[in-house]
Amino acid sequence: MSSITKTIRLSGKAGGSIEDAVRTVLARAATTVSDIQKFTIVKVGGEVDDSGAPTFFTVTLDITFGIKDPVEHG
């Protein structure tokens, strides 16, 4: 685990539940970011159909990951 971290903010949505939306955002982040250590839910929202039932849940996450230590050459 790196002693230096960086935090990025990402948003995404999924049908089903807030948890599904969180998992979707984290899974997508993991395809390009390594050493994800934690997340914080910053905002939760959603979309509804004509009857008022939720159709999608939207989340905004702060995702923290470790920064790789420099490699010493020599």
What is the predicted function of each stretch?
Residues S2-F39:
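Short, well-ordered alpha-helical segments
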Residues F39-E47:
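Short, conserved loop-to-beta-strand elements that form functional interface hotspots
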Residues S51-G74:
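C-terminal structural segments of small proteins and small subunits
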Residues G12-A14, K43, L61, F65-I67:
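Flexible glycine-/small-residue-rich
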